[in-house]
């Protein structure tokens, strides 16, 4: 490990260079922010460096010594300055730009500006950052300063997750970032527009807080007004593995259409169950910021999710289509469909230690899943002018999921241990239909009206079966004991109808302040039915019909509220105080028992933003929330949560209260290419719903209860990334601490969890040399419980290296290696490695690409994870796919039609949806 640390800290590339720096102004001496300074190597004719002037007009450019460069200084609306220079020492040179009559795009320039700043939009030229090894959009984005793609495929800009991805101003699969980053070919990307302060609605842009909202708009490379592009990839290898992946895109001014297909058994699911449930289709909770939260449960069937999209075997199929059609009168019709099928084989072993009784349970699970997931969305938007916008959306989400598990469980103390074999099955076919209507209207310069409504129709129908040798709940359930095994089945049906509507009125007092009045209603109706039965050896069914085992519940929740918010900007400060008055009515009916609660509440909120510069801010947010549960925690008859866990709800649960403080700092320096992100969060929940558990051995019976003990959590994070001409480095740290109490066997159980994550990386960024990234991640997880004085600590160290290189004439080599060292405070639990490599060849000018890839070169077998809850800590080891070799061939489908955009006088670029103006506080 010491050698690894030395390598991480040892400089990789050192060469002599000097800088040219100075100040850029107009002829009157006013500083110009956002001017580009680019340097083209006169010998190679390659863009070799660029800089951007900061808010004071200063720029800095580092260049190789004794090399002649052509320097060009440009800014929109000003005549460029151009000259040749060769450096052997640092020099200072200032520039005074003159305004020009013609637009910049009418002036012939050899190289496009790498970065252009237009108000709240930053435009990156892809070619200025590409190194030649990029295959997909994710690879392009990773080269750009301030943009990251995380392990989940989400895009982060300036530390914030991007809400939406558009292509040529049109939503791509409703803006889903993972589908875009993994499927859009890199060679099609011309420019990347980062849309700051993004909002779906133009009219509300200036009266709502959008500082954390970012979107990306991808401009395609070719200048034609209509064309096809895409690629078809096919691959195979030993053991009859396969990959087939067609991607076809058609774009024109008023119509676009996309088809993405994928079929593979190489462990690369294009869309997992987790992604499927994350895919909201653009629907947001209308009451999310009103001070009320009601958690409508989904995916209650207990189907397992993959760990980091890795398993013993994964077979995936995907077919996705997306379209958009519009006219010049403000009408746009769009939609998408997604079908995904995954067959997963999961094999894992779990060691679980219970805090209360020090019993250790060792389980082995062999799981076979078959998940078919479907999504369909249709949208109509009408925006005839700048004062009116209408929108209707409908989203259908349905799936067919089943899971069969062979489970072995061995538990006890010392030599007194029990062994049991279980056969567990789960089936569910949930669906949801979500509809949304929006209307926005601006009346004059002072008044804005908006009306939004949503309706959710959802049903879940999980069925669970368990065949086991031992009855773990002898005194609770009257099973027939004269059978060779206990064959138990449970059915549940939960129907939900949720209606939300709110009306907003905005009054613009002046350029610095406005008032917002909101009237809204949230209405939830749920029905819940569950029962279970025993199947005898003969096939006869024994139903448990007692009310203790059968749930039949009707639940209603209504929140009527009125809110007043005030927004004012003075100097560097923006204040957003608000207050919301709520009237709540909740009731549930279970057989002859009726429970009703009527309450009212006042919930304040406050947001203070300090905008030191356009790219530097500090923000404090305070919010109080009343938190309600849904019907799942209210149903008082027994249900099985798992093979060793029974659950009973509490019909008289009360709402909890959550207080949240959030502090965030952000600094983006385009002059030095240094970004700093930091934040802190504190959350306190009182009267929250916690569990009261009776634990016998490893078997448990849980009931929810309103806890008199607060639940507190703290988090801190920080990240610093820095770029120079050919190097980029990043340091990150994150702390998470939580403390909560539950009742276990009538005793208070206090649980503390502390997580620490550290990361550091250094990467080169050459255009004409191989690039390498080295990094190191260090994670510590500590779990404490008041029942057990032993502190459970798990450590993970992960050094890694990535290499990508373009060489010869058309060869691209990519490789990634990581080593994971996993231990607790007493012993090493596992060490495992990931090493993948890929070599491809594409002849210049050819549409064909050939490649060979090897995954899991070292053929490691398993991965470890750890976690904890109020009852136990556990470490989990699961098998992953073995080494495989894949031979691939790819064909480029790009074809053109129509005229060049510049030749069509009536053509215009599609403006990004939702970011086309609107008033704003000055």
Regions found by a protein language model. Name each.
Residues 43-58:
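Short, acidic Ser/Thr/Gly-rich low-complexity loop/linker segments typical of extracellular
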Residues 514-618, 788:
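Signature of Gram-negative outer-membrane beta-barrel scaffolds
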Residues 759-777, 792-922:
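Conserved C-terminal beta-signal and adjacent last beta-strands/turns
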Residues 364, 498-500, 544-550, 648, ...:
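Outer membrane beta-barrel strand-and-loop segments of large Gram-negative receptors
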Residues 40-46, 68-83:
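A short, solvent-exposed loop/turn motif at the edges and junctions
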Residues 17, 29, 56-58, 79, ...:
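Membrane-proximal, glycine/serine-rich, low-complexity loop/turn segments characteristic
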Residues 21-33:
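Structural motif
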């Amino acid at each position: 490990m010491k050698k690894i640390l030395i390598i991480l800290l040892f400089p990789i590339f050192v060469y002599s260079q000097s800088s040219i720096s100075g100040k850029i102004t107009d002829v009157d001496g006013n500083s110009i922010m956002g001017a580009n300074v680019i340097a083209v190597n006169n010998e190679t004719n390659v863009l070799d460096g660029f800089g951007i002037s900061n808010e004071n007009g200063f720029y800095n450019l580092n260049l190789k010594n004794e090399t002649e460069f052509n320097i060009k200084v440009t800014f929109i609306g000003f005549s460029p300055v151009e000259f040749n220079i060769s450096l052997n020492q640092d020099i200072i040179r200032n520039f005074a730009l003159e305004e020009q009559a013609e637009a910049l795009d009418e002036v012939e320039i050899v190289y496009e500006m790498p970065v252009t700043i237009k108000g709240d939009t930053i435009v990156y030229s892809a070619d200025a950052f590409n190194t030649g090894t990029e295959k997909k959009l994710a690879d392009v984005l990773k080269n750009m300063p301030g943009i990251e793609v995380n392990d989940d495929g989400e895009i982060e800009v300036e530390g914030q997750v991007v809400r939406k991805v558009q292509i040529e101003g049109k939503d791509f699969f409703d803006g889903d970032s993972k589908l875009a980053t993994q499927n859009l070919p890199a060679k099609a990307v011309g420019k990347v527009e980062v849309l700051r302060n993004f909002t779906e609605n133009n009219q509300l842009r200036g009266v709502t807080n959008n500082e954390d909202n970012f979107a990306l708009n991808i401009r395609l490379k070719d200048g034609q007004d209509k064309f096809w592009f895409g690629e078809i990839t096919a691959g195979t290898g030993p053991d009859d593995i396969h990959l087939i992946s067609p991607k076809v895109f058609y774009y024109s001014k008023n119509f676009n259409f996309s088809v993405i297909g994928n079929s593979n058994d190489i462990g690369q699911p294009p869309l997992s169950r987790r992604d499927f449930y994350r895919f909201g289709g653009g629907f947001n909770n209308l009451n999310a910021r009103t001070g009320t939260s009601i958690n409508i449960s989904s995916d209650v069937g207990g189907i397992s999710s993959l760990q980091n999209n890795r398993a013993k075997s994964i077979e995936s199929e995907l077919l996705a289509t997306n379209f958009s059609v519009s006219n010049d009168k403000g009408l746009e019709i769009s939609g998408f469909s997604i079908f995904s099928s995954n067959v997963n084989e999961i094999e894992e072993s779990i060691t679980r230690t219970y805090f209360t009784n020090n019993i250790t349970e060792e389980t082995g699970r062999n799981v076979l899943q078959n998940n078919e997931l479907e999504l369909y969305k249709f949208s109509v938007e009408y925006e005839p002018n700048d004062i009116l916008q209408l929108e209707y959306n409908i989203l259908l989400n349905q799936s067919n999921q089943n899971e069969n598990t062979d489970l072995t469980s061995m538990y006890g103390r010392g030599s007194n241990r029990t062994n049991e074999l279980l056969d567990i099955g789960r089936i569910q076919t949930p669906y949801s239909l979500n509809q949304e209507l929006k209307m926005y209207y601006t009346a004059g310069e002072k008044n804005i009206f908006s009306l939004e409504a949503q309706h959710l129709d959802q049903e879940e129908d999980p069925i669970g079966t368990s065949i086991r040798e031992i009855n773990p709940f002898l005194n609770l359930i009257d099973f027939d004991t004269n059978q060779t095994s206990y064959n138990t089945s449970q059915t549940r049906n939960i129907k939900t109808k949720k209606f939300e509507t709110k009306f907003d009125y905005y009054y613009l007092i002046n350029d610095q302040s406005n008032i917002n009045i909101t009237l809204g209603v949230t209405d939830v109706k749920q029905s819940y039915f569950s029962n279970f039965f025993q199947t005898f050896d003969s096939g006869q069914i024994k139903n448990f019909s007692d009310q203790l085992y059968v749930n039949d519940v009707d639940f209603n929740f209504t929140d009527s509220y009125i809110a007043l918010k005030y927004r004012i900007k003075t100097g560097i400060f923006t204040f957003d105080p608000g207050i919301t008055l709520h009237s709540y009515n909740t009731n549930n009916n279970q057989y002859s028992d009726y429970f009703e609660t009527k309450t009212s509440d006042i919930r304040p909120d406050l947001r203070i933003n300090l905008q030191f510069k356009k790219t530097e801010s500090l923000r404090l947010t305070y919010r109080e929330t009343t938190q309600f549960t849904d019907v799942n925690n209210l149903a008082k008859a027994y249900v099985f949560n798992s093979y060793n866990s029974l659950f009973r709800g509490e019909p008289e649960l009360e709402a909890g209260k959550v207080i949240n403080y959030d502090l965030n700092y952000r600094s983006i320096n385009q002059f030095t290419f240094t970004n700093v992100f930091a934040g802190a969060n504190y959350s306190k929940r009182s009267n929250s719903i916690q569990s009261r558990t009776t634990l016998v051995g490893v078997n448990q019976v849980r009931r929810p209860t309103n806890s008199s003990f607060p639940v507190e959590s703290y988090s801190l994070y920080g990240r610093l990334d820095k770029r120079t001409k050919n190097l980029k480095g990043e340091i990150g740290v994150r702390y998470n601490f939580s403390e909560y109490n539950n009742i276990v066997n009538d005793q208070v159980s206090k649980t503390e969890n502390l997580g620490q994550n550290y990361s550091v990386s250094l990467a080169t960024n050459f255009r004409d040399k191989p690039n390498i990234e080295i990094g190191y991640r260090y994670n510590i997880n500590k779990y404490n419980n008041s029942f057990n004085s032993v502190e459970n600590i798990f450590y993970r160290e992960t050094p890694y290296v990535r290499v990508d290189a373009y060489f010869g004439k058309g060869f691209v080599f990519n490789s990634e290696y990581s080593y994971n060292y996993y231990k607790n405070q007493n012993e090493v639990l596992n060490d495992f490695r990931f090493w993948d490599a890929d070599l491809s060849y594409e002849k210049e000018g050819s549409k064909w690409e050939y490649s060979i890839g090897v995954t899991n070169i070292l053929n490691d077998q398993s991965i470890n994870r750890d976690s904890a809850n109020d009852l136990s800590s556990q470490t989990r080891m699961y098998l992953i796919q073995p080494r495989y070799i894949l031979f691939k061939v790819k064909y480029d489908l790009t074809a053109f039609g129509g005229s060049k955009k510049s030749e069509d006088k009536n053509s215009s670029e599609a403006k990004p949806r939702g970011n086309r103006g609107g008033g704003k506080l000055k």
